[in-house]
Amino acid sequence: MSLAIVHSRAQIGVEAPVVTVEVHMANGLPSLTLVGLPETAVKESKDRVRSAILNSALQYPARRITLNLAPADLPKDGGRFDLAIALGILAASMQVPALMLDDVECLGELALSGEVRAVKGVLPAALAARKAGRTLIVPRANAEEACLASGLKVIAVDHLLQVVAHLNGHVPIEPYKSDGLLYLNKPYPDLNEVQGQLAAKRALLIAAAGAHNLLFSGPPGTGKTLLASRLPGLLPPLSEQEALEVAAIQSVVSLAPLSHWPHRPFRQPHHSASGPALVGGGSKPQPGEITLAHHGVLFLDELPEFDRKVLEVLREPLESGHIVISRARDRVSFPARFQLVAAMNPCPCGYMGEPSGRCRCTPEQIQRYRNKLSGPLLDRIDLHLTVAREATALSPAQQTGDNTAKTAALVADARERQQRRQGCANAFLDLPGLREYCTLAKVDEGWLESACERLTLSLRAAHRLLKVARTLADLEQTEAIARHHLQEALQYRPAAIN
């Protein structure tokens, strides 16, 4: 009678809780019993593992085998436990030394031939293994991804026989050395390519400098989508911690976390997207668009065309920076600290306010169109701007305004001031931080309170207005928020919603 224990990792949301594979062998009729709340794919591991061991010229024990995946109440799916199960059986049958598995974690799916295949969600498991101080054995196809967790000892393998030879000391495998991830020089469209629209460019600069939410409104063809596509080029690079969080999310949904390293995500879902597609969901909760836009930009074009119920689910993550998906068996929290940029037309036909008088929408149609956007949702958007039509110029003169590089430098300076002062962008300041870093002179405080009363702004809107004023002061490299900062910030608030 013998017992072996091997460590592995499950995948729950973007977390990787530890799973202990316990293998017990006893005399009796040859059988293999798998317990510990395994899903169908894990139950199928029994046949894959048996074939992989036999086809690797190793001995499959003809004994009664009991496999337990602990903790039993943790859901487990996929083929990620195949390698750990195989090594547990080999250790229990004394074909590999069990002591060599004490400080090792294993991930990998086995082919019938014994080859070790790639699995998804390796980066969260690598970060957890580094924290636990263990070595991680992964398929070679996942090794570069696992090395994103700097300081982690990674063993890359192609076949089950390689692992057995390594653990027995016959052919030791050197820790995998990453080739080094190059910072991809992704070309962004230049801000100078947008003709005119100086006010909109100014709003874009403020939004980038303080991570503020932004809503463009205007007739079709005025450059709203064009302007929004320029925002990613203005944002500062991700920090190492932020880049790891983004890559971990992409690893979970199999979006090749190394292909966009380390750029900020830019997500643009279609207006027909459902609620689960936007915020996440499913019987086994998966990340939605707001999580895929974590530390990046979520652009919602044609905002009123989205279903109202879909838009309303954005309220909580816009405030908290995360979303909780609850199901009968699971309750999973996903990160969702994104910057919302939206665009919309002023009416169903899009031409309200045009001098040509093309709009034929009735007041009832316009009201019904705008009612799709609730007051609480619009209240959470810091910058509201109407993008007017510019004079048509098919061959415009050379733009004299700042290009993307110059604007990005201003944004970087402002963000650096914010990080030194409070450790986050202005848009993410909580109430204590707002009171500490957005103080006003008594006369300016009274002026702002009076203005908010006249414009019937909510307290939340007033707080967001203060954050925008703080960003304007940072762009001017001044510590004190002046009256003209408040006046400009007030221009970006709608006097009345709907």
Q: Which residue ranges define each predicted feature?
A:
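Basic, amphipathic alpha-helical bundle interface domains used for macromolecular binding and assembly
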Residues: 35-46, 61, 68-78, 285, ...
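Residues immediately C-terminal
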Residues: 112, 298-299, 305-306, 392
